[in-house]
Amino acid sequence: ALHAEKHDGEEPGPFAANSFDMVQLVALALEQAGACTGVAINENIRSVSEGGEPVSSFAAGKEVIAAGGDVDYEGAAGPMTFDESGTVAGSYSIKAARDGAWVDEKFYPASAFE
């Protein structure tokens, strides 16, 4: 909805939520590490995506981290829990292009893949 407000009613593309979540996770990992390196991301990205206080934005996560807490980022595309191989099983939506717009055909929540 926020995207549509800022972009003359245009809806975001089918992967916008995933892209948004990736940026949020990386930013939270860097915030938690206090460093801006690939190693910092690698060492912190899992810990900001599970086991802490649920947050859905960088701003909320930054506050929790600043207070010494742990965060569990719950993304726009669903939960961001990594498996042992580093994959996130997110929610899936089957979409179709109709009359110049994306429409949802079927939605599968992340919990369906656990």
Language-model region placement:
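Extracytosolic ligand-binding ectodomains
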Residues: 1-114
